[in-house]
Amino acid sequence: MKTLILSSSLADNSRSFLLCKAVEEQLLARNNNITLVDARNTPMLPVHKELTTEMRTLSKQVKQADNIIIGMGVHCYSVNDSLKILLDTCFSAAAGKFYGILCAAGGERSYLSTMHLTQICMNEWRMMQLPRIVFATAKDFKEDVISSTELLERIKLFSEEFHVIGNKLLT
């Protein structure tokens, strides 16, 4: 199973990147073929401009992936601008793919913010979402480490379900 994990936050201390790395580790342990893309290393331009080399590479990776996991931070109860640019410019080949969401937010009241990403993926490309979302807040981290055992268990369960369902959808 070829899984693309997109960490979309541009923050130097991105907590959603930590979630992506934790899921990557879990899926690698299950012998999945993982490509992790860190948006911090992807120069981007808006949809009306020519794509950068890195954006063209991401478009190819989306096309080649069997499924996709998207890591996002919350900004004003929605997806961040970098994720929106990457969705608008690089996801045309995502139609019908299975996907999952990892979300890091500053506070507990942002838990519905992932619904905007769900609407985009389901309405634009008819993607199929894993019904489990990993949602974390600042209290789940100590500096740059996931400190919550509950969050680690949710990551493990998300990864197990993503692996099992993703493989079933391939057969």
Predicted regions: what is each one?
Residues A95-G96:
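His-Asp phosphorelay/catalytic-motif detector in bacterial-type signaling
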Residues T42-L45, T137-E143:
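A short acidic, often aromatic-flanked loop/helix-cap motif at beta-alpha or helix-coil junctions
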